[in-house]
């Protein structure tokens, strides 16, 4: 089985020589198997590993026992580990989300923090074929498009999934044969929550009455559809670049494209400005209609504005240029400026907003001379987890922020930009597990 995982890693180029891979280690069987397999491949494939464990604040004493187990396991293998705690039930209530939704976002935030702590460049998670089948089936019943039916990718950004080639049964057999101890989460066997119901009730029913090889069939379908999706996205990227102009995209060029390619062009444009996460099918439809609208027409979608400007369609945050000014930042309410409103509210530690026009930061790290002002020559910005600072102008260029969107009010201390709409917060004020005064900063345009 280790050989299969090794071949899967090589086939999908998940790990390269010299990589440092952070393993998301819950202590459950899947993550323990992942740790054991990757540990055995370290020398052969020339990479190193470390681990991270997050106590979700859900299962009381059992969760503390899991954390102790992970600590002891990492000590046994001589692996450095990073631990953390989060009150996910409270976070879910604050956001109006389910435990699943809140937990997933915070879990990946935590893993990114641990990755930065260790200087790792990959994060390995223990999703397997049964998880893949669940995801595909869940997207299917929710009416997903082709992208959702592809399931989870072996690699997306710095997240890798080396066990997607194995079934749950194969992992359990491996744990038994290798005599590996692991923790059992009793809540996984309670048919509450969408995924648990799917895992415990729906999939067994479909396997029993329709297709005993349901998991394998769904995973094979996902792989085939992924090839189609990849090809369509390549075409869309080429067409989007061909339509790219200064400040936007050629409306006429986009309007000539077939609907499957056009919708992917729009998703790619939204992704460039960090506004794809909450974009739904209805938003894509509205943007397609906007292509034929009069100049100056504008619509708002979560995290962005889209508007027409003569022959162009523009994606970003629609603003008007303002003169130079500065004013103090209110840390417990709203601050009105010429360019828009800054709103500061308490937030949960480890919270992460869904666009680059808001950020959760450590208010205790704000310098005494912090203020809101227009950008100035000589300003510098140090993006979170970046190796160093750079000129603000270069940061805007790297983020592909159109010129007309670079004069939003920013927050600064001297020449150091602490928060810039479209870029997010600076390294110097980022949250960590020890932060005591977490606040959310939002910029709301006029």
PLM features: residue spans?
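Inter-helical turn/loop segments and adjacent helix faces that build the functional surface
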Residues: 205-217
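Core alpha/beta nucleotide-donor-binding catalytic domains of modification enzymes
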Residues: 1-25, 29-204
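Internal, active-site/partner-interface "lid" segment
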Residues: 188-189, 193, 216-226
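AMP-forming adenylation/ATP pyrophosphatase catalytic core
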Residues: 2-30, 48-50, 54, 86, ...
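Short, surface-exposed loop/turn segments at secondary-structure junctions
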Residues: 185-189, 212-215, 278
């Amino acid at each position: 089985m280790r050989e299969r995982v090794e071949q899967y890693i090589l086939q999908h180029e998940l790990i390269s020589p010299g990589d440092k891979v952070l393993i998301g280690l819950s202590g459950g069987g899947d993550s323990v198997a992942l740790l054991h397999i990757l540990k055995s491949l370290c020398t052969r494939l020339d990479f190193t590993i470390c681990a991270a464990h997050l106590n979700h604040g859900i299962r009381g004493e059992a969760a503390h026992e899991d954390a102790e187990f992970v600590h002891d396991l990492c000590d046994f293998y001589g692996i450095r580990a990073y631990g953390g705690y989060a009150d996910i039930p409270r976070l879910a209530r604050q956001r109006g989300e389910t435990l699943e939704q809140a937990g997933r976002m915070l879990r990946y935030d935590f893993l990114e923090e641990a990755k930065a702590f260790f200087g790792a460049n990959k994060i390995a998670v223990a999703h397997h074929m049964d998880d893949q089948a669940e995801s595909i089936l869940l997207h299917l019943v929710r009416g997903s498009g082709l992208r959702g039916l592809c399931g989870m990718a072996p690699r997306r950004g710095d997240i890798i999934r080396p066990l997607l080639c194995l079934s749950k049964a194969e992992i359990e057999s491996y744990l038994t044969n290798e005599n590996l101890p692991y923790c059992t989460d009793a809540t996984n066997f309670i048919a509450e929550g969408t995924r648990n119901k799917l895992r415990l009730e729906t999939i067994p029913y479909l396997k029993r009455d329709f297709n005993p090889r349901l998991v394998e069939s769904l995973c094979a379908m996902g792989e085939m559809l992924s090839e189609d999706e990849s090809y369509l996205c390549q075409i869309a990227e080429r067409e989007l670049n061909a339509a790219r102009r200064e400040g936007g995209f050629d409306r006429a060029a986009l309007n000539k494209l077939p609907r499957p390619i056009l919708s992917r062009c729009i998703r790619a444009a939204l992704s460039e400005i960090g506004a794809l996460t909450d974009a739904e099918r209805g938003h894509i439809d509205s943007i397609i209609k906007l292509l034929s609208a009069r100049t100056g027409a504008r619509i708002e979608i979560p995290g962005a504005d889209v508007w027409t400007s003569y022959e162009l369609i523009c994606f970003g945050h629609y603003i008007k240029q303002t003169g130079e000014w500065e004013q103090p930042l209110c840390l417990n309410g709203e601050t009105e400026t010429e360019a828009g409103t800054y709103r500061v509210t308490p937030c949960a530690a480890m919270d992460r907003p869904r666009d680059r026009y808001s950020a959760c930061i450590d208010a205790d790290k704000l310098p005494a001379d912090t203020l809101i002002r227009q950008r100035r020559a000589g300003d510098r910005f140090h993006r979170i987890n970046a190796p160093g600072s750079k000129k603000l102008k270069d940061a805007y260029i790297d983020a592909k922020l159109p010129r007309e969107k670079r004069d939003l009010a920013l927050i600064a201390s001297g020449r150091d930009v602490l928060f810039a709409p479209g870029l997010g917060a600076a390294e110097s004020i980022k949250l960590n597990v020890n932060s005591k005064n977490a606040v959310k900063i939002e910029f709301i345009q006029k």
